[in-house]
Amino acid sequence: MFILNAIAAFGNWFWGLPILFLIVGGGIYITFRLGFVQFRHFGYICSQTFGKMFAKTGDDEISSFSVACTALASSIGASNIVGVPVAIAMGGPGAIFWVWLIALIGCATKYTEVALGVKYREKNEDGEWVGGPFYYLRGLGGGIGKFLGGFYAIGLMIELIPSLAAQGLSATSQFAIFGVNQVIVGVIIGVLIVLVVAGGLKRIGKVMDIMVPVMAVVYMVGAFIVIFANIGNLIPAIVSIFKYAFAPHAAVGGFAGSTIALALRWGAARGVYSNEAGFGTAPAAHSSADVDHPIRQACWGVFEVTVDTLIVCTVTALAVLASGVWTSEKYEAGALAQAAFNNVFGAFGDYFVAICVFLFVFSTLIACVYYGQRQAEFLFGVKFAKIWRWIYVVFMVVATTGIDLTMMYMITDGFLAAIMIPNMIGCIVLVGQIAELQKEYFNTPGKYYLADVEAKKAKKAAK
């Protein structure tokens, strides 16, 4: 118990100023080294991602969109519905400004992670592409690279145990509203997860290709209805985000008030948690893509952060702020999104939010089990990894019988801190290699970026 408390205490400390120095400072450095690529080439990035979501690929190929959906399944979770309102409740409307800023900086970090994942990927025993921090950290060279790679793999493999337990409880608890036994639901979910993951990334990709876009669109349609029902408060809500990012907010109703420091702290933490830039998890999925260059796949890293944080989180924030529920004394921080939907949809709002949270968390569980399996494979081989995924399911089902959810999240925070440190060190030190790859991608005549530009011109001329 002492060890778990120590891990939780470390996580609580880390998610203050240290996270700002590491993620924000590191992200700014990476942004400068890459020449502000997420801004300078944003139009091109959109054309290669949003513009090619439904591009056809070969039967045996794993498309960039499929792996992006798998990575999005991990980042689009309960945090998008529950975490964002908590940031508002604790840090005021200004917290959302810092969520956005972290996302803009995080685009470069995620871009770097994905590019490194593809650059350093290898073929496993089954002939599949595998990669992630546990591979690219070895690019640091010598014993330190091997140590950090192994440390990351062990850390994430263990971190996913409390994370999956907490996420599993979040998913099954949504069925309480329907009067269904949580343990039975947990067992069913566990079996479904293993059936999906057992098919490898191809099967996961096929499921996520449908599930992620549908659940995101359904949720956003509902949130937009809430926003339009409170359209008169939309502009004041947007103004408050910018105003209170740089000014304290006085207490009002059930809101206890906030300072600039609180807005920054909660906005930064939620921003990082939401898009997972700096975690190093997404490259495990992206490394499997059939793609001609690491930078082409890196564009999907920017796509992920844009969808997860700049779109989905923003819609949640505006729904909560415009509805005014965040200042009410009747609701707890974690129930603000549900309250906003209830004000418009009535009792149906409870069911709508419960279903959305379940779908978001279920997709996250699938992605996380896959990530954990990859760590186990790196450390102990393919056979052990196939057994290890069942260990995750067992812990998830046991969690449905009742666990201290707060402690699980605190332990998760501690382990996340431990794995983010080596991953960010790797990204910062190795970003020079990505800068070189970027030059190759954007400047090689007749290939990659320039070939795409010429193809676009030819298409226009043909019209």
Regions found by a protein language model. Give the residues of each.
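N-terminal alpha-helical transmembrane segments of multi-pass membrane transport
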Residues: M1-A78, I88-A95, G106, V398-A399, ...
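Alpha-helical membrane segments and immediately flanking helix-loop junctions
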Residues: T57-M90, L116-K119, E125-F134, R138-L140, ...
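Helix-loop-helix module between adjacent transmembrane segments
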Residues: I30-T31, I102-G127, P133-F134, R138-V197, ...
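Extracellular/periplasmic helix-exit of transmembrane alpha-helices
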Residues: Y111-E125, F224-S240, P248, V252-F255, ...
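Selective recognition of specific alpha-helical transmembrane segments in multi-pass small-molecule
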Residues: I105-E113, V187-L201, V212-G232, R265, ...
